[in-house]
């Protein structure tokens, strides 16, 4: 009798175990299906700067409430996207500011051809030509321009009765007149590669946009060619002659090579220099300080005025979108909004003008650019050649010209030789290996696995009980790959992410998590599920209601967080966000604030391992 009873019990137990196993398996399959559905419904947009995350991204999402857009702050570096491409992590939509077709060539076959889209058709041909591949395809489109030219202290001109420049000859005459009264007519921050590069090109914008100039640029940028391309002998020799003449006319010397932005703007503010090369944003800055400031273009020696422009960013779409009609349609909707006038208004700094390359965006100039209206209306907005080679070689060669070490002919030869030289092999020593790729799509049941890997790893690095991070802290690039130093460093958001450590009570931690999840006055407010924070050492429950979020629960080690618990907490955010999120009286300070990028770089240099992800958030 006892034996029969035991057998029945064993049978019932076995059936129960089997039932639980089947139920668990079903739940796991259901969870996988849900995550796959979330993946398919999500359009990922990588932003080149966190500044776009705060104003631009929320607007784009607000215009497309039926599209789940996940914005991630990536890197302003095409090498970063090449790495993602090589390891299966290229996002749906890419933005990059430091850009050239030359450097983007390896990505061409992975990007959609936008040539026949309405978005490409709206770009003025003058500018679209700079983005055409030799086969006529177009993978990248520019948004609005950042205008660079001469920031001019008009009050100094009036004080010394010196006429404002209207052409190159009068520009030189003004420089000479100021020198007679002990004031520099012109200088700029030639310690930077971009100032060297843009001066060289800006002085010859008229020539570089001729038929011969465009032909050379197309050849230089051709993604189908693997051969290195040097300078031509038609347009470029004259460019170095004009640079040499400019150096002589403005009396630039080796001393100017040490000047940075703060040095130059300080000289301008103090009336020590009348003109410098810079962005139109400088006009508003100095006008707000009470200095009568205007913006003037480059005066070409052939008489044409030109503005040097760089798109705030270029945008491209992943070709894989063409395999799914529904996802492609969603991505095109996102692109359309990203390029709209209203969205572009949220890219520029306060008071700056929108100089759009698109015919769909009307020209509305403020007082800060009214002096160059005719230049803009004539489409004399030159888009710089901005390959990595051009940045580096311009810095080297133009600096030597300013120092008096190279003549125009020598500079041309040196520049050409460096462009043609074989690339030095990159430092590909592996500092970090990830044996598994983790999804960086936010899932309602768990959060983002890739972000969780980063948060859990950094919690161990900082030796803290809890880590809280704004969603823009990580680039989401936890791939199954070997990482060199540069790519490992790029796993952290590049724009000034800092850490602050506190010892807190449970009540103080609840208040802090509340600010991260729901937003706070003067700080960042999450605008979609992908912008919710990342946490480690705790798990949170959040309620979603038409784009707003409410914290409903916090657990630690599986138990509700107690108000009297004591925990060490590390918070990650930009400096501006940190001040709003974590007031000085929130807990007790533990050490000084540090830059996360530096901490991460030190960690990976010492032989890093990545932590496993955890389900850190449940969104209901």
Please provide the spans of the model-predicted regions.
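Extracytoplasmic "Venus flytrap"/periplasmic binding protein-like
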Residues: 62-126, 155-166, 266-267, 274-275, ...
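Hinge/lid segment of periplasmic solute-binding proteins
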Residues: 97-148, 163, 172, 198-199, ...
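Conserved N-terminal structural module of periplasmic/extracytoplasmic solute-binding proteins
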Residues: 20, 26-101, 164, 410, ...
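Long, aromatic- and glycine/proline-rich binding clefts that accommodate carbohydrate-like moieties
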Residues: 296, 346-400
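Extracytoplasmic/periplasmic substrate-recognition and gating elements
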Residues: 287-350
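Extracytoplasmic/periplasmic solute-binding protein
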Residues: 139, 172-228
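Glycine-centered hinge/linker elements that transmit conformational signals in sensory
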Residues: 218-257
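Catalytic centers of hydrolytic enzymes
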Residues: 427-620
């Amino acid at each position: 009798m006892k034996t029969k009873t035991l057998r029945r019990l064993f049978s019932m137990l076995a059936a129960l175990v089997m039932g639980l196993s089947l139920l668990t398996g079903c739940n796991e399959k259901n969870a996988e299906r849900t995550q796959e559905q979330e993946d398919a419904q999500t359009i990922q947009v990588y932003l080149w700067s966190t500044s776009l995350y705060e104003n631009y991204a929320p607007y784009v999402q607000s215009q497309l409430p039926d599209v789940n857009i996940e914005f991630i702050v990536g890197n302003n570096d095409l090498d970063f996207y090449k790495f993602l491409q090589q390891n299966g992590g290229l996002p749906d939509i890419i933005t990059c500011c430091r850009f050239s077709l030359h450097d983007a060539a390896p990505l061409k076959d992975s990007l959609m051809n936008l040539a026949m889209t309405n978005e490409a058709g709206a770009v003025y041909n003058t500018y679209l030509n700079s983005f055409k591949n030799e086969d006529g395809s177009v993978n990248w489109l520019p948004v609005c321009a950042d205008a660079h030219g001469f920031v001019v202290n008009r009050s100094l001109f009036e004080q010394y009765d010196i006429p404002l420049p209207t052409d190159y000859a009068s520009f030189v005459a003004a420089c000479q007149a100021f020198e007679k009264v002990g004031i520099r007519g012109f200088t700029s921050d030639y310690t930077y590669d971009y100032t060297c590069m843009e001066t060289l090109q800006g002085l010859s914008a008229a020539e570089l946009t001729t038929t011969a100039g465009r032909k050379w640029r197309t050849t230089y940028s051709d993604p189908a060619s693997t051969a290195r391309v040097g300078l031509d002998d038609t347009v470029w020799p004259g460019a170095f002659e004009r640079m040499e003449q400019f150096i002589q006319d403005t009396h630039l010397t080796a001393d100017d090579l040490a000047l940075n932005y703060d040095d130059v703007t300080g000289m301008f503010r103090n009336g020590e220099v009348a003109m410098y090369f810079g962005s139109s944003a400088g006009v508003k800055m100095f006008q707000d300080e009470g200095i009568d400031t205007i913006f003037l273009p480059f005066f070409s020696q052939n008489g044409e005025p030109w503005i040097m422009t760089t798109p705030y960013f270029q945008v491209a779409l992943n070709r894989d979108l063409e395999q799914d009609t529904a996802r492609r349609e969603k991505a095109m909707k996102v692109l359309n909004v990203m390029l709209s006038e209203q969205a572009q208004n949220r890219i520029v700094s306060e008071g700056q003008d929108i100089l759009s390359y698109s015919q769909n965006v009307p020209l509305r100039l403020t007082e800060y650019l009214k002096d160059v209206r005719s230049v803009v209306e004539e489409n004399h907005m030159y888009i710089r050649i901005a390959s990595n080679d051009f940045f580096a070689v311009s810095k080297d060669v133009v600096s030597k010209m300013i120092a008096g070490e190279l003549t125009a002919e020598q500079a041309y030869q040196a520049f050409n030789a460096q462009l043609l030289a074989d690339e030095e092999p990159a430092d590909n020593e592996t500092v970090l290996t990830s044996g598994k790729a983790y999804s960086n799509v936010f899932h309602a049941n768990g959060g983002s696995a890739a972000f969780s890997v980063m948060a859990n790893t950094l919690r161990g690095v900082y030796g803290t009980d809890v880590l809280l991070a704004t969603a823009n802290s990580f680039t989401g690039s936890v791939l199954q790959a070997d990482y060199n130093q540069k790519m490992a460093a790029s796993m952290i958001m590049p724009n000034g992410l800092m850490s602050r450590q506190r010892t807190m009570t449970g009540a103080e931690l609840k208040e802090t998590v509340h600010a991260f999840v729901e937003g706070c006055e003067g700080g960042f407010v999450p605008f979609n599920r992908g912008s919710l924070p990342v946490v480690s050492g705790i798990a949170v429950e959040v309620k979603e209601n038409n784009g707003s979020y409410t914290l409903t629960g916090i657990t630690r080690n599986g138990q509700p967080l107690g108000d009297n618990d004591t925990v060490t907490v590390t918070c990650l955010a930009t400096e501006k966000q940190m001040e709003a999120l974590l007031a000085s009286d929130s807990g007790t300070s533990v050490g000084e604030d540090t830059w996360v990028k530096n901490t991460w770089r030190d960690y990976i240099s010492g032989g890093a391992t990545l932590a496993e992800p955890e389900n850190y958030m449940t969104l209901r």
